[in-house]
């Protein structure tokens, strides 16, 4: 994949060793540490329009999720354990410790947001604040899977099918699939919101059969272990205790299932939120508005 360092001016590259393999990250800026996590079918590059603005106030760590982008791919098992959001969160905590950050702020989009809220539920003492972009909790998505929503996020069921069914089908035309997925979730319904260099980065990553397998394992974990972890928390009345911001696209995925802020109030003790004039990909479709909201939230006194 192309390096694309020019999309992250002032950032350096880090390969961070953990007990489950290396995590790739770009690190830039000075100030309190802020970890940014991407989603499917992307890499850390999706933050390129927002990270430099955040780096004016924070030390920003933009990481590839375990198995995605340039991060190592932990070997999976029948329970998809390394790709549960719980396991991913633990590995990213370890990576942050390696960088010297035991306590940090966290923002995640899509799958990265699922890792983020799981980290907040399992290890709240690690976080100062949490932001999630264009998601509802995994449990809520599955519980709200009516006809309209099942058609909109069909990939949740498709990618969760037993291996190698989705892997083999995706291998028929991976370039078409990844570009179609990106375009279909934007407000405009095309690729015009993306930097072409970023799209090429996502395309090359998705072209790797092993990376596609990891993405399927991510969704298999979401359909089984992640759902059960969420179910235990919601039934026990456990809530995210740290200050939380929920942002969603006015034309995004989360708002089409429910009113996001109402849902998150069931899951978090101190949550605020608002829509962004965007589709699903807030940091690329509406970077100024997204960056402004994140800076305001993370800069405010607790």
Curated annotation (Swiss-Prot):
Residue ranges annotated for the AB hydrolase-1 domain, each copy included: 32-270
Name the Pfam families for this protein: Abhydrolase_1
- Where in the chain is the site Important for enzyme activity? 134
Reactions catalysed according to its record: a haloacetate + H2O = a halide anion + glycolate + H(+); fluoroacetate + H2O = fluoride + glycolate + H(+); chloroacetate + H2O = glycolate + chloride + H(+)
Q: How does it assemble?
A: Homodimer.
Under what name is this protein listed?
Answer: Fluoroacetate dehalogenase
Q: What does this protein do?
A: Catalyzes the hydrolytic defluorination of fluoroacetate to produce glycolate. Has lower activity towards chloroacetate and bromoacetate.
Family classification: Belongs to the AB hydrolase superfamily. Epoxide hydrolase family.
Residues bound to fluoroacetate: 111, 114, 155-156, 219
EC number assigned by the record: 3.8.1.3
Instruction: Name the residues annotated as catalytic in the UniProt entry.
Output: 110, 280
A Gene Ontology molecular-function term?
Answer: haloacetate dehalogenase activity
Keywords on record: Hydrolase
């Amino acid at each position: 994949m192309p390096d694309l360092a020019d999309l992250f001016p002032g950032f350096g590259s880090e390969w961070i060793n953990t007990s489950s393999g290396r995590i790739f990250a770009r690190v830039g800026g000075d100030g309190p540490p802020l970890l940014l996590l991407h989603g499917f079918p992307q890499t850390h590059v999706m933050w390129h329009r927002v990270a430099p603005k955040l780096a004016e106030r924070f030390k920003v760590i933009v990481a590839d999720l375990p198995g995605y982008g340039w991060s190592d791919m932990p070997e999976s098992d029948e329970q998809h354990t390394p790709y549960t959001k719980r396991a991913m969160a633990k590995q990213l905590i370890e990576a942050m410790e390696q960088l010297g950050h035991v306590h940090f702020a966290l923002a995640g989009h899509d799958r990265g947001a699922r890792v983020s809220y799981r980290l907040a539920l399992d290890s709240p003492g690690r976080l100062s604040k949490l932001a999630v972009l264009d998601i509802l909790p995994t449990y809520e998505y599955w519980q709200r899977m009516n006809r309209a929503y099942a058609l909109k996020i069909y990939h949740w069921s498709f990618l969760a099918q037993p291996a190698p069914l989705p892997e083999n089908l995706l291998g028929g035309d991976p370039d078409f699939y990844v570009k179609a997925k990106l375009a279909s979730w934007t407000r405009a319904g095309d690729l015009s919101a993306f930097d072409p260099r970023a799209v090429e980065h996502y395309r090359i990553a998705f072209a790797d059969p092993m990376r596609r397998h990891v993405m399927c394992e991510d969704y298999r974990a979401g359909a089984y272990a992640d759902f059960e972890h969420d179910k235990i928390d919601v039934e026990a009345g456990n809530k995210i205790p740290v200050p939380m911001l929920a942002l969603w696209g006015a034309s995004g995925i989360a708002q089409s299932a429910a009113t996001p802020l109402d849902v998150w109030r069931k899951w978090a003790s101190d949550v605020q939120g608002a829509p962004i004039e965007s589709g699903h990909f807030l940091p690329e479709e509406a970077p100024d508005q997204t960056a402004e909201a994140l800076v305001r939230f993370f800069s405010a006194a607790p």
